[in-house]
Amino acid sequence: LANSRYDLAVIGSGPGGYVAAIRASQLKMRVAVIERDLPGGVCLNWGCIPSKALLNSAETMEAIRGAGKEHGIEVGEIKLDFKRVIARSRQAADKLSKGVLYLLRKNKVDYIEADATIAGPHTVALRPAAGKAAPPAEAVEAERILIATGSGEKLFPGMALGDGVMTSREALLHDRLPKSIAIIGAGAIGAEFGYFYQAFGAKVTIVELEPQMLPGFDAEIAEELRKSFVKRGVKVLTGHGFKSMAREGEEWTVTLDAAGAPKTIAAEAVLVAVGRNPLSLDMGLDAAGIEADRGYVKIDDSFRTTCPSIYAIGDVARPPLLAHKASAEGIAAVEIMAGVREPGFDLLSIPGCIYCEPEVAMVGLSEAQARERGIEVKVGKIPFRANGKAVAINQTEGFVKIVAGKEYGDVIGCQIIGHHATDLIAEIVLGRTLETTTAELGHSVHPHPTLSESIMEAALAAEGEAINF
């Protein structure tokens, strides 16, 4: 290793880095992946996977609670072992993390445990990572370098973690269920953990500075989720900014700013979910003349940075901060390097998903965004209460909304809130890739009874041809 030179050195083994490395190896490149933490990065170990395991436990709890009332299945006293809930999520993360290491080795990618910094256009310096053995060399040389370091949790200035104050990372390990929790931020992380904690009986208050939950999402979707959360007993405070917090006895007193008027709430625990920062600091960007904007590494349409031999993908390069976007960018970047793909990447075709219940999914432009761009649109909207499968399984919350071009019916965007929304959105993603129209979607026969029929029905609604609503 000390004397070897790679075609590509990838810094970070998350969903962007490990996928890029494997694709590069398939394209006959000699590849090394450098990781300072665990194989799979944040997504597999501290994000997507363990959090979905927790949400599955929450859904199971809700199903058990409703078994008698909904299905006539009486159960005895429900006992919760919250430590096992957390342990199960860690097992899922550990299993997939080991799977990533296996895939890298299977594809002949060298995996190096080290803390990496860029020392030049073709050099990555290696240092011992925290808690890890010394790396096998002091540096790695590569024809090209790919930065895939991801992002980290954002905190308010001066805020210290511990004593019940957490980000999502700490929450994934916190094996004592708080009686009450204040969640600062009503984006994807805030919504998912809000649902999780309320399902297990915690008193949940979600605080959001913006006037709606899920800032940036379709307003109708956000309002539907707010109503669902309130119905479940979650207190949602939109238009409230965080000011300060202080420990008082067994609880935290959180002071908020509501249009200039102070307001306080008390909670045993506080979860900070106000976004993430790209992990580009202390990376040695200056050593290779790499420019960044607010921490995001600047890239062109080939994912190349301001240093011609160094590329960047995923959270460290640009929003949206999504694992599947990082993976897709990783594949695109190495294929462009190999000359088998043209530059360019369609960010509008990247779906965004939130895995609380009801689930939320979107792709493309919302109705408001399309109109702001001067696009004439037609909209088809179908509630799940008009869907036979949804009624049969008692999952009638939410709706499907398809936004299409007025003249040709080209699918501009879709927003879904409801059961399995995050699975249903894939049909629209494929449709956008194939430049499908609402007429084509609506006239494609969907199996009955399925939730996917709501996609067909919403497409028909956009054409003025809805049958079941």
Predicted regions and their residues:
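Glycine-rich flavin
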Residues: 2-6, 22-29, 34-177, 205, ...
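FAD-site-proximal beta/loop scaffold in flavoenzymes
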Residues: 162-177, 264-339
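N-terminal Rossmann-fold NAD(P) dinucleotide-binding loop
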Residues: 17, 190-191
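Flexible, glycine-rich terminal cap/loop adjacent to redox cofactors
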Residues: 9-16, 22-37, 49, 53-60, ...
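Beta1/beta-strand and adjacent pyrophosphate-binding region of the FAD-binding site
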Residues: 2-14, 177-187
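Short hydrophobic core segments
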Residues: 9-11, 116, 139-150, 183-184, ...
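Gly/Ala-rich phosphate-binding loop of Rossmann-like dinucleotide-binding domains
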Residues: 21, 25, 194, 198-199
